[in-house]
């Protein structure tokens, strides 16, 4: 669901795709460094998350440690999830997505880059999803603006 501008009392038209194909953006952002790490994958499961954690681990500065905020999705809490040594997972309480800074990123991407779009095929879904993430990741000010939370800042 998205929002669009329309005259009061009118019913705006928007393209709609009723197929059931999708991909998943596994994304993370560091507001202080204004850096991001992401993978676009065909499934959301513990194997895909392990790939994402490995990608984040590679992007963490040497000697640094990353704290990732996670919700309670099943694959986020898998017992066999391999978490790299330079990453700590912070699990949110149930039904509290507003505490996850990345939720605003997903809302932004859906509302500004991916909404009201009909995709040609699966490859087009992947291409446009990657383009949406790249648009976000290439703007350090936007990364900081959307993901910064005063309660989540660690001062060294």
What kind of region is each of these model predictions?
Residues 6, 10-18, 85-104, 118:
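RNase H-like polynucleotidyl transferase catalytic core
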Residues 102-156:
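C-terminal anion-handling pockets and recognition modules
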Residues 48-92:
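RNase H-like DDE/DDD metal-dependent nuclease/strand-transfer catalytic core used by mobile genetic elements
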Residues 39, 78, 108:
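Residues that scaffold the ATP/ADP-binding catalytic core of kinase and kinase-like folds
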Residues 22, 70-72, 90-114, 125:
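RNase H-like two-metal-ion nuclease catalytic core shared by retroviral integrases
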Residues 30-33, 73-76, 95-97:
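Short, solvent-exposed loop/turn segments at secondary-structure junctions
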Residues 1-54, 148-156:
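Extended, low-complexity cationic-aromatic segments
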Residues 1, 78-81, 102:
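Short, well-ordered secondary-structure micro-motifs
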């Amino acid at each position: 669901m998205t929002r669009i501008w329309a005259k009061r009392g009118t019913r705006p038209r928007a393209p709609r795709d009723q197929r059931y194909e999708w991909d998943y953006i596994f994304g993370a952002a560091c507001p202080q460094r204004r850096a991001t790490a992401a993978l676009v994958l065909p499934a959301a499961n513990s194997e895909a998350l392990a790939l994402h954690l490995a990608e984040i681990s590679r992007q963490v500065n040497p000697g640094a440690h990353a704290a990732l905020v996670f919700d309670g999705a099943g694959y986020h809490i898998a017992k066999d999830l391999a978490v790299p040594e330079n990453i700590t997972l912070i699990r949110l309480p149930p039904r509290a997505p507003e505490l996850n800074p990345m939720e605003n990123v997903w809302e932004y991407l859906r509302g500004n880059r991916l909404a009201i779009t009909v995709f040609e095929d699966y490859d087009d879904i992947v291409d446009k999803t990657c383009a949406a993430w790249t648009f976000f990741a290439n703007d350090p000010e936007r990364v900081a603006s959307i993901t910064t939370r005063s309660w989540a800042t660690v001062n060294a």
